[in-house]
Every structure is written in C-alpha cells, then in structure tokens.
C-alpha cells in the first residue's frame, strides 16, 4: 500500500487547489472502475489512494462534462459501494467497513448512481437539469435487461410504446403521439442516437446494446432539439471508445421459444489518444404466435446489428469520433388475432391465411468533431442515415374464408428513407454570470414509399380491388437556436432560449387502381413551407444543496405535411398544418440523506393548437390527417429512488394524465370532449436491484413491476378500440465473480404471463394484437 503521508501531501497540493479552480472538462466512459479512476487522476491531476482489491471488479457509469474534480469523483463512485474520506487534504477510497464515517464525510457506499445526460446540449448530471426526465444509466439498462424501447417504457412514467404493425410502432410521451404511416409525415416524439435524429419510428425500434445512458425528456423540447418533439425526446447515448485500456466483453443468452442471443464488444487503444471499438449483437427467437391457416410462425425475431466507433485526438483540444452502424431484421409479421369471425379463442394464433413477412435494414455513418477552447467548445455533428423496410401483412383480422361481407385487405408496404443532417453549435464556458449554447442545424430527407393493397372478397377470395400508391416526399429543414442561463442570484437562474425553424416539403403521389383505372391520378411537385419559433423560459431556484425547483414555459411543434395515403387528388393537394404545444410546468428535483434518497416530481399543463389526427371523414369517406383544433393535457409525475444499503437500490414512479380534445369536429362527427388517444390516465411502477457481497462473490438480482391504466387508441373514443389495464412483472437472479469478470443470471419477463393488448382493430372484424408472453432463460456475461 502506498505511503499515506506522501499521498496526503500530494493531495493537499493538487486536489484541494483544484477544488477551488475553474471546472474542468472531464470525459471518462462507463466501464471498469479501476481504469476509470486512473483516467480521473490523469485528467484532473488529483492523486488518489486506494487498495486494488477494493476497486477490482466494480463498474462505474462514467462521467462526462464540465465539472469540478470533487463532483466528478462523486459521480464515478456513486453506487459502487465505496466511500471517500477527505482528511487533511488526502483523498482515500475504501470499502464502507474500512474506516469510520464522520459527519464531515459523505458516505459514497450508499449513494445513488449519478446519470450524465445531454438534455441541454451539455454534459450534466440529470439532477442539475430543469427538465422533467427519466434518466437510465448503463448499469440500470444492463440490470433490468433493457433490449428495446418497450423495455424503456417499463421503467419510465409517462412513456407508452405499442404497435399495429412491425413497421409502424407508436411512441407516446404524456399522451402526445400519432399513428400516421405516410411517408414524409412526422412524429411528435423524437428519437436521437448520439445527437443524430432518427426520422422514422420504424428505424428507431432497433436492438439496444452497448449503451452509456438513455434519457427520456418529457414535454416539448423544440428549442434545443428542433421540430417534431412536441411530446418529448428519447436521447440514446452509446458508450464511447476507451483510449486507456484493452477491453473484451461478451454475453450469451439462451431461453424458451428458441431464444438465442450473443452480443459483445472489443475496445482497442491505438495510442496518442485514439481508440477503436466494435460492438455487435445477434438475436434469434422462434415465433410466439402462429397463423393456424398457413402454419407459419409469427412474432419471431431474427436481428443482427454491428457498430464501429473510432476516437481520434487530432490535436490538443481537438477530438473526432467517427461512427458507422448496420442493422438487419426480419420476422413473420404480427399475430393479429380475430375475436369474432373464425376465432379459436387463443390470442397467440391468427386466422389470416396470409404469408406475412417483415424485412428491414438500417445503416448510417456520422462524424463528431469537438474543439475545446479557452473561449468554449465548438461541436460539429455530420450524419448520413438510410433505412429500408418492406412488410406484407393482413389489415383485416380474419381470412376472407370466414367473412360474410366486405373483404380482406392484404398490404405490401415498402419504404426507403435517406437523411443527411448537419449541426454546428457553440457552448460557452461557465462564466461568472451564466453560460450560453447556440447553433445551426440543417437536414435533408428523401422518402419514398410503395403501398400496394389488395382486397379479397368475402367467401370467394376474388380480387375486389387492387391499388398501388407510389409516394415521394422530400423534406428540407433549417434552424438556428440559442439557449442561455443567467445567474440572477447565487441560488436563482433564468434560462431563456428560442429556435427558428423553416421546413420545406415537396410531395408527389401516383395512385393506380387495377380494377378501376378511371380513378387513377398523378400529382407531382406539390410544395409548401412552414416556419415556427419555439421559445423556452425556465426559472430555477436552488435553496439548498441537492434541492432544485423550476418553473418553465416551453413550446414545441410538429411539422405540417401532405396526406400521401390519400385516395383522391383533391385530398392529396390539401396539406395539413403544423401542430404546436405550449407546456407550463412546475418541477422539483431533490436528493436527501447524502444522496441516499432521490425524489423528483412535476405538474404540467399543455395546450394544443391544430393537433394532427388521422380520422375518417364521414362526408367524403376518406381516411385523412386533419388538424383537430384544440386539446388540453394536465398531468403530474413523481419518481422516487432509495438506496438503503450499498447493495440495494429501490425505485418507484407514478404518472397521472388527463388529456381531452377541446374542439374536434370532422364532417358530421363531433369528437370534442373525448379523451386523447394513447393516453392512459395512470401509470405506475416499482423496481429493485441488488448486488449483495458473499464469500464467493456477489448475489445479483433485479425485479420490476409496471402497470398501465386502460386507454383508447383512437380519437373517436370507439369502445371497440379501448385497451384494458395491465401490469407486467420481470425478475432476474444470479451470481457474479468477486472481480466482476463473469456473471451467470437466470431471468424471466412477463412473469405472470399476462396477455396484454398492444392494439385493437375494427377493420371488417374485431381483432387484437397482444404483447410478448412469458419468456425466460439464462445469460452468461464475461468482461476481460
């Protein structure tokens, strides 16, 4: 063990002086704790004293951003079961039992994890950001086996993820969503991966692996994230390459329904501040559903993903991160099960008689350049992405052989989206009186879609209609934004920001009807431009350490567009307007008992103007996107986290939502006063995870339960589209080696085997689509 007197003297000269100095730019990725502490010492100049056996095998969530060394060290050690003692300038790290706890020492062993987020385009602790959010660390994502956005929703109050088809998942935050599938039509919840916007939900439903954090930002984020975030944003940060150590990690999973999965990564330091990391995932699973007419499996999984990242120090203070990713997914479609004609009473079988199929590829490259200067930081993010998908599915929940009238629709839906985006922003240092972030943004999106629909007549299967819609929508968006914080007093901040966005869309549609050629039409070169200013104002008060309250007013907007699914030229030529949301919010973020208890809460009031909804116009009989007029959403959310011991984390959350259409009249139908679609009134969840030390290593485990209230999926409040309330429980338990190099885990999802509904359908017959059944298995993880 090193000489404590010598270390104490060094710390007195370095650490204490650094604490009083200007904040430092610190960048330490999530991973093993010992190399993280070594990087901390190099980046801060602080000398640390610890025993190797105390830190071996422990993991850290990392830290990134402009922080003082003391707070950065707290963040690195949070949740590790280690404590920090500062005595006479010395900085000593030890197990809880290794030394006494005094009133002047913070007990790091029972502190909750600190999650670093970029919600304000800076790296900050989630507790320091005056925005309602749920922030999930790398440790939480791994512990609770988060593999997709539906798993994220289990741990996030106010987030709903469901689907009618594989290519068109629905994502709602605080009830803000839409179910549009047309090309060039925007969603009100934005998904961002490493600050790159994913323009279509079908490209956002990918396998989640090798992540640093996920933050779900709630409410409009129009100032810093631009258009199409009226409901909020899901910000996904991948783990960056580590320039300090060679690392190999892997996990093998096997389970019921033929589940087999392998994922892993290799990290290679290249010297001179450069590193390369390659991570990959491959997953296969047999179908959990079956079409009893064709015998084909449905809801199976066949997914492969790979990501490569290179970090290069181009010059002192200049860093570049280059990324490339590729994903390929396929399955046999979803199990849309009839509960009327042809039904056999089993929700895991369908009566479609159609060879459903889903194929998708996504790929992208990006370059992130950061210049750290004395006058601030300049960041450039350039990205190119392409997604292509095709899906064959039955839109009616029963084969034509069971129908007594009408017809069975069979759809082939193909789309391809190519996007280039460029963001350039400046972040000032933390000046005495505040700081500012400002920047420019541009995106160019080209979207093409071929939508073919055949109608098979009842009983006979004769071709009743056959239409093909070839859609093309090109979108250009440019924006300029600024967001600044002014310190009005030592404990009071005022944040003011605004963004100006200009969207231009051009659209074309060629629609042909094989049996009724007289109805064919072609419309090209439709163009429209929409401009919007989205401001933000936040008043923040920090009356005590670990306590923050905020009052905010924000605006978001979802861009306008064209009804590319229109069945008449007149309907296509008529654009719909943008929707805007003004959000007024009062929030609290607090930490108690030396960060053993965390309590966050918010109440909000949202006012919609021109809300976009897909409804059937009773006067024309055409399914069209309309601006619904006005709507109001009131709600509240609360999240509680407690760490009663170094080996145990507990959490609970609750969300309340009351959203209604104030004015919404379409043709002869008045939807005013109806509840908003995809808006469960109540959501609640509890979770626990443990890492208990024993003689042979650690006992590890996690448990969670998430409950959602009943809600309707349509604006007309059709009782046939009402989904019942449900709750899901997940469990895992296992053992981990003393040094953390391996872990064996048994897990089960949907423990009670609940047949919960993702959606209902009323096309010709009533039908339903249920979520995954109970799944269970084993996983073996290794880290070297």
What does each of the following model-derived ranges do?
Residues 404-428, 467-469, 473, 477-481, ...:
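Outer membrane beta-barrel strand-and-loop segments of large Gram-negative receptors
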Residues 311-315, 426-429, 433-435, 441-443, ...:
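Structural signature of Gram-negative outer-membrane beta-barrels, strongest in the C-terminal barrel
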Residues 186-188, 200, 209-215, 223-291, ...:
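Outer-membrane beta-barrel translocator/receptor signature
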Residues 271, 295, 299-436, 443-445, ...:
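Outer-membrane beta-barrel domain signature, strongest for Gram-negative TonB-dependent receptors
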Residues 427, 437, 487-494, 503, ...:
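Gram-negative outer-membrane beta-barrel transporters
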Residues 368-396, 542, 548-558, 575-636, ...:
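Membrane-embedded beta-barrel scaffold of Gram-negative outer-membrane proteins
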Residues 267, 417-439, 584, 677-784:
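Conserved C-terminal beta-signal and adjacent last beta-strands/turns
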């Amino acid at each position: 063990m090193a000489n404590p007197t010598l270390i104490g003297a060094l710390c007195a000269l370095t650490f204490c002086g650094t604490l009083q100095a200007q904040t430092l730019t610190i960048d330490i990725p999530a991973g093993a704790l010992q190399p993280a502490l070594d990087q901390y010492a190099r980046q801060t100049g602080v000398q640390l004293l610890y025993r190797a056996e105390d830190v071996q095998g422990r993991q850290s969530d990392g830290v990134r951003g402009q922080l003082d060394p003391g707070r950065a060290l707290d963040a690195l050690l949070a949740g590790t079961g280690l404590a920090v003692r500062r005595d006479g300038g010395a900085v000593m790290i030890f197990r809880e039992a290794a030394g006494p706890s005094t009133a002047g020492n913070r007990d790091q062993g029972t502190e909750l994890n600190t999650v670093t987020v970029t919600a304000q385009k800076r790296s900050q602790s989630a507790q320091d950001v005056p925005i309602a959010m749920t922030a999930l660390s790398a440790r939480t994502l791994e512990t609770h086996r988060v593999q997709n956005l539906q798993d994220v929703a289990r741990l996030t109050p106010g987030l709903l993820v469901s689907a009618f088809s594989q290519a068109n998942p629905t994502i709602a935050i605080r009830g803000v969503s839409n179910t549009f599938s047309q090309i060039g039509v925007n969603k009100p919840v934005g998904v961002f991966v490493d600050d790159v916007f994913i323009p279509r939900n079908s490209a956002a439903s990918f396998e989640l692996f090798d992540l640093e954090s996920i933050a779900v930002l709630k409410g409009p984020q129009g100032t810093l994230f631009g258009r199409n975030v009226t409901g909020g944003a899901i910000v996904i940060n991948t783990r960056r390459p580590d320039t300090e150590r060679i690392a190999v990690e892997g996990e093998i999973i096997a389970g019921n329904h033929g589940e087999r999965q392998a994922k892993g990564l290799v990290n290679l330091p290249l010297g001179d501040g450069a590193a390369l990391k390659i991570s990959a995932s491959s997953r296969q699973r047999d179908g959990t559903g079956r079409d009893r007419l064709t015998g084909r499996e449905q809801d199976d999984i066949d997914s492969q993903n790979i990501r490569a990242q290179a970090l290069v120090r181009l010059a002192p203070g200049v860093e570049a991160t280059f990324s490339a990713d590729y994903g390929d997914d396929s399955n046999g479609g979803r199990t849309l099960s009839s509960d009327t004609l042809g039904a056999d009473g089993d929700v895991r079988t369908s009566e479609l008689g159609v060879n459903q199929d889903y194929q998708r590829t996504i790929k992208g490259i990006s370059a992130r350049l950061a210049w750290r200067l004395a006058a601030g930081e300049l960041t450039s993010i350039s990205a190119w992405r392409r997604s292509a998908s095709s899906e064959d599915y039955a839109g009616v929940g029963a084969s034509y052989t069971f129908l007594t009238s009408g017809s069975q629709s069979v759809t082939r839906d193909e789309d391809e989206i190519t996007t280039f985006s460029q963001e350039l922003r400046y972040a000032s240092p933390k000046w005495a009186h505040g700081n500012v972030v400002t920047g420019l943004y541009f995106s160019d999106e080209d979207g093409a879609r071929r939508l073919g629909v055949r109608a098979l007549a009842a009983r006979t299967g004769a071709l009743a209609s056959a239409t093909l819609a070839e859609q093309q929508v090109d979108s250009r968006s440019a924006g300029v934004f600024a967001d600044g914080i002014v310190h009005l007093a030592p404990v009071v901040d005022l944040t003011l920001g605004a963004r100006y966005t200009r969207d231009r869309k051009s659209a074309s549609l060629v629609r042909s009807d094989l049996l009724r050629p007289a109805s064919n039409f072609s419309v090209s070169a439709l163009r429209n431009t929409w401009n919007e200013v989205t401001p933000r104002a936040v008043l923040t008060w920090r009356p005590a350490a670990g306590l923050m309250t905020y009052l905010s007013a924000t605006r978001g907007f979802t861009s306008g567009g064209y009804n590319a699914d229109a069945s008449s030229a007149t309907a296509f030529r008529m654009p719909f307007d943008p929707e805007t949301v003004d959000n007024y919010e009062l929030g609290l973020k607090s930490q108690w008992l030396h960060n053993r208890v965390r309590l966050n809460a918010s109440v909000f009031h949202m006012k919609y103007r021109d809300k976009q909804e897909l409804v059937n116009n009773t006067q024309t009989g055409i399914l069209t996107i309309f601006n619904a007029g006005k709507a109001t959403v009131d709600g509240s959310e609360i999240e509680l986290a407690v760490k009663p011991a170094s080996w145990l984390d507990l959490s609970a959350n609750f969300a309340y939502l009351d959203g209604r259409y104030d004015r919404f009249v379409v043709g002869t139908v008045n939807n005013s006063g109806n509840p908003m679609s995809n808006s469960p009134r109540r959501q609640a969840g509890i979770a626990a995870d443990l890492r208990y030390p024993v003689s042979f290593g650690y006992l590890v485990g996690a448990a969670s339960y998430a409950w959602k209230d009943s809600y309707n999926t349509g604006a007309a409040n059709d009782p046939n589209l009402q989904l019942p309330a449900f709750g899901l429980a997940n469990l895992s338990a296992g053992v981990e080696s003393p040094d953390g190099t391996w872990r064996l885990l048994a897990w089960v999802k949907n423990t009670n085997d609940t047949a919960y509904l993702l959606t209902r359908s009323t096309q010709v017959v009533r039908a339903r689509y249920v979520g995954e059944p109970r799944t269970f298995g084993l996983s073996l993880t290794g880290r070297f």
